[in-house]
Amino acid sequence: MVHLTAEEKSAVTTLWGKVNVDEVGGEALGRLLVVYPWTQRFFDSFGDLSTPDAVMNNPKVKAHGKKVLGAFSDGLTHLDNLKGTFAQLSELHCDKLHVDPENFRLLGNVLVCVLAHHFGKEFTPQVQAAYQKVVAGVANALAHKYH
């Protein structure tokens, strides 16, 4: 559960309504793979991830980034039940994929950076604070199965 004030919730949903999930998702996942290259080990089937350009232009990275942000969008409509919303994904990432749960926190922080880049002055410190709460809540929900 993420505790947001009415103002924070409004800021998150208003900005999210302007997000191009295809573009931002691919960029966020791509940046995760470039900035934290050890995360690439989970994406062996994605082909060429040998350079930053290869990662950022990789169609499989872009497609999976879109999928990730689609799940994140779903979470935004269930802020009061993030653990339930992400239960199946938590189980998949824990039991089958064996993803280090720290990667969820890293991706959340990268997403905040990408949103700041895309929205500039509109991404005020108050908006950032609200998004940091949300991405922390999502990361916690995704890591739930690990506990």
From Swiss-Prot:
One of its GO terms (biological process) is hydrogen peroxide catabolic process. The modification Phosphoserine is found at S45. Keywords: Acetylation, Heme, Iron, Metal-binding, Oxygen transport, Phosphoprotein, S-nitrosylation, Transport. The modification N6-acetyllysine is found at K60, K83, K145. The modification S-nitrosocysteine is found at C94. Gene3D superfamilies: Globins (1.10.490.10). GO terms for molecular function: haptoglobin binding; heme binding; hemoglobin alpha binding; metal ion binding; organic acid binding; oxygen binding; oxygen carrier activity; peroxidase activity. Transmembrane segments: none annotated. Residues 3-147 form the Globin domain. It comes from the Eukaryota. One of its GO terms (cellular component) is hemoglobin complex. The modification Phosphothreonine is found at T13. It holds the Pfam family Globin. Red blood cells. The modification N-acetylvaline is found at V2. Heme b binds at H64, H93. Involved in oxygen transport from the lung to the various peripheral tissues. Heterotetramer of two alpha chains and two beta chains. Belongs to the globin family. This is Hemoglobin subunit beta. It comes from Sapajus apella (Brown-capped capuchin). The gene is HBB.
